[in-house]
């Protein structure tokens, strides 16, 4: 017998009417994305006086996400990334309303973070660059979308893997694993696309700097990668009751 689809659960009406935690979760996402942009984008903000190194940017983003995940993961899941939120939505692990609210506050937090950077350092730095996402002139638009999709795919697979409730073999720190996947994505692709992996991270600086050239790439690429990763994990990799855990890794 086919199970009847509960549209109210899919839409998520109860997330607003009955969930008293939703406002704490939204505040956590807003603050988390704010600090991701302040610290992460702040690390790639350069001017005529200096230029940040690739390892500096990569590990700043990775360690910032790992730190925030440890701090607010128990409250909101620490998505702080619309692509991650869409990944949870597409496999039915978040409602539509809750996902829209998450993405909205993530974007607000990103704008606020970028604005703080601009206000805080614009007087001290000439030729201020807020780390607006852009891709190499040697790439086509399609290649840029593909690269963003691939590096976000890795991020979301790691997020789904470390948060899989069926796993008993997880060792080490889940937040650190997520952070390292972000650092790896930056080390791989920062010279190619800027390694956004996060539409909100690109949206905040774009709003504050009013720079929109090919901005859509940084929504489409990460979201496509997140959707593919989430679907693959749910239908192929997810641990199910009765799975043989003897195949789990052991160091």
UniProtKB/Swiss-Prot annotation:
Q: Which domain of life is it from?
A: Eukaryota
Q: Which family does it belong to?
A: Belongs to the MIP/aquaporin (TC 1.A.8) family.
PROSITE patterns from the UniProt entry: MIP
- Motif NPA 2 extends across 198-200
> What UniProt keywords apply to this chain's record, in alphabetical order?
Membrane, Repeat, Transmembrane, Transmembrane helix, Transport
Q: Which InterPro entries match?
A: Aquaporin-like (IPR023271), Aquaporin_transptr (IPR034294), MIP (IPR000425), MIP_CS (IPR022357)
Which cysteine pairs make disulfide bonds? none
The chain's Extracellular topological domains, given as residue ranges, are 47-56, 121-138, 191-211
* Residue numbers covered by motif NPA 1: 81-83
Location in the cell reads: Membrane
- Which parts of the chain span the membrane according to its record? 27-46, 57-77, 100-120, 139-159, 170-190, 212-232
Q: Which residues lie on this side of the membrane: Cytoplasmic?
A: 1-26, 78-99, 160-169, 233-251
Query: NCBIfam families given for it?
Result: MIP (TIGR00861)
Q: What is known of its domains?
A: Aquaporins contain two tandem repeats each containing three membrane-spanning domains and a pore-forming loop with the signature motif Asn-Pro-Ala (NPA).
Q: How does it sit in the membrane?
A: Multi-pass membrane protein
Q: Under which name does UniProt file this protein?
A: Aquaporin
> What's the stated role of this polypeptide?
Forms a water-specific channel.
GO terms of molecular function: channel activity
Do the record's keywords include Membrane?
yes
**Which Pfam families does the entry mention?**
MIP
- Assembly and partners? Homotetramer.
A cellular-component GO term for this protein: plasma membrane
């Amino acid at each position: 017998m086919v199970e009847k689809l509960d549209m109210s659960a899919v839409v998520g009406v109860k997330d607003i009417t009955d969930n008293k935690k939703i406002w704490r979760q939204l505040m956590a996402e807003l603050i988390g994305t704010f600090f991701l942009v302040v610290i992460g984008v702040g690390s790639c903000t350069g001017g005529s006086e200096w230029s940040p190194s690739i390892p500096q940017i990569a590990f700043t983003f990775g360690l910032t996400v790992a730190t925030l995940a440890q701090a607010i993961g128990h409250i909101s899941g620490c998505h702080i990334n619309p692509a991650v939120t869409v990944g949870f939505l597409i496999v039915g692990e978040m409602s539509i309303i809750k996902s829209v609210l998450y993405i909205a506050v993530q974007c607000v937090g990103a704008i606020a973070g970028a604005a703080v950077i601009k206000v805080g350092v614009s007087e001290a730095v000439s030729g201020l660059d807020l780390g607006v996402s852009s891709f190499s002139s040697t790439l086509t638009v399609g290649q840029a979308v593909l690269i963003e999709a691939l590096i976000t795919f890795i991020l979301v697979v790691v997020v789904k893997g470390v948060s899989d409730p069926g796993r008993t073999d997880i060792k080490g720190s889940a937040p650190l694993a997520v952070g390292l996947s972000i650092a790896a994505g930056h080390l791989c692709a920062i010279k190619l696309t800027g390694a956004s992996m996060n539409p909100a991270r690109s949206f905040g600086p774009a709003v504050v700097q009013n720079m929109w050239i090919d901005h859509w790439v940084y929504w489409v690429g990460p979201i496509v990668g997140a959707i593919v990763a989430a679907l693959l994990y749910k239908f192929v990799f997810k641990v199910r009751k009765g799975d043989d855990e003897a195949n789990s890794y052991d160091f």
